[in-house]
Swiss-Prot record:
Protein name: tRNA-5-methyluridine(54) 2-sulfurtransferase
Keyword Zinc: yes
UniProt-listed Enzyme Commission number(s): 2.8.1.15
Cross-link (Glycyl lysine isopeptide (Lys-Gly) (interchain with G-Cter in TtuB)): K137, K226, K229
GO biological process terms on file: tRNA wobble position uridine thiolation
Post-translation changes: Conjugated to TtuB via covalent linkages involving Lys-137, Lys-226 and Lys-229.
Residues annotated as binding Zn(2+) 2: C274, C277, C286, C289
Phenotype caused by lack of the gene: Disruption of this gene completely abolishes the presence of m(5)s(2)U in tRNAs, although its precursor, 5-methyluridine (ribothymidine) is present; other nucleoside modifications remain unchanged. These deletion mutants exhibit a temperature-sensitive phenotype, they are unable to grow above 80 degrees Celsius.
Length: 321
């Protein structure tokens, strides 16, 4: 197996693309493909300041690395979720990455900001841990982006992630949800734009970039992810991919190019300001504030919080690197 560009020994073979490349040309190809996706979907302006959501895993650190190499002012945001040793190691890896490259890192500690980490939040809210965690992360990432002056947030979602989400959405189809799936969610008042520059890279392709660049990342998965439906969807799609290389990419591209443009969701849902935090919501109080208000009420009943303490939605990130 030789590199298609130079004829030297290939380090990465991509059956789905009919391509094999050596280390040097794979890294070049990966960066150029990312840049092509950014330009194709007008994700970012040249040299723009962008907030990168970083967990310490391979996808988010690789994205931070690539965006920095492409000349964007990429600032990392890490949320310490309070999930025991897993969260501690995630923060350590992220801080080391930022420190070694001289990159700016913002950190929000969920427990310091609101009094509870994800395990306690799940118990007190009555939600599944992934649901409570996901809602909190989405809210905090957007709030930090808006209040720190970022127009756009970039996340490391890859092809496997996006194909699995699409698979799940098609099993339980809702036009409004399907119409929102894609590599870009545009900016709105009070809502930063969301972009996914890695949406056409498989998990293996991102991993290959991470390893060949020598990026140290957290290998372990979140302990709360065990049993998640998304893992089942990924397993099913991997089974298809093994027999039909390129199936996941065709599945996602086909939806984005042929089906999504035809989805008519009618008038957009009207957004208003949340009475508690002022951020956009469809009701009087947003889901984030409702959840945390309920958590504080239950915590007080269980004597976990003093009566005089009240939930305050605003957080101020710490600059850690």
């Amino acid at each position: 197996m030789v590199c298609k560009v130079c004829g030297q020994k290939a380090q990465v073979e991509m059956r789905s693309r009919g391509l094999a490349l050596c280390r040097e040309h794979y890294l070049d190809w990966f960066v150029k493909e990312t840049e092509r996706a950014i330009r194709r979907h007008r994700m970012l302006l040249p040299g723009e300041r962008v907030l990168v959501a970083v967990s310490g895993g391979k996808d988010s650190l690789a994205l931070w690395d690539v965006l920095s190499r492409l000349g964007y002012q990429a600032v990392g945001l890490h949320i310490e979720l309070g999930i025991g040793e897993y969260s501690k190691r995630s923060l350590e890896v992220t801080q080391a990455f930022a420190r070694e490259r001289g990159l700016e890192l913002l950190v929000v500690d969920l427990k310091e900001a609101y009094g509870f980490g994800v395990p306690e939040l799940a118990r007190l809210s009555g939600r599944v841990a992934c649901s409570a965690c996901g809602l909190s992360k989405r809210y905090i990432i957007n709030q930090v982006a808006v209040e720190e002056g970022f127009r756009v947030v970039a996340t490391g979602h890859n092809l496997d992630d996006e194909a699995a989400v699409l698979f799940g959405n098609l099993l339980n189809p809702q036009e409004e949800t399907l119409s929102r799936q894609g590599p870009v969610l545009p900016e709105k008042p009070g809502l930063a734009a969301r972009v996914k520059p890695f949406y056409r890279f498989s998990e293996r392709e991102v991993l290959s970039y991470t390893l060949l660049r020598g990026i140290r990342y957290l290998h372990e998965e979140c302990p709360n992810a065990k049993g998640a439906k998304s893992l089942l969807y990924k397993e099913a799609l991997n089974l298809v991919e093994r027999s039909m290389p390129g199936a996941k990419l065709r599945f996602l591209d086909g939806f984005l190019e042929k089906i999504r443009p035809r989805l008519d969701v009618g008038e957009e849902v009207a957004l208003r300001e949340c009475e508690r935090c002022g951020y956009p919501t469809t009701g009087a109080v947003c889901a984030f504030c409702r959840m945390w208000d309920a958590v504080y009420r239950r915590a007080k009943k269980r004597k976990l919080l003093p009566e005089e303490v009240s939930f305050r939605p605003r957080v101020k990130p710490l600059r850690a690197g």
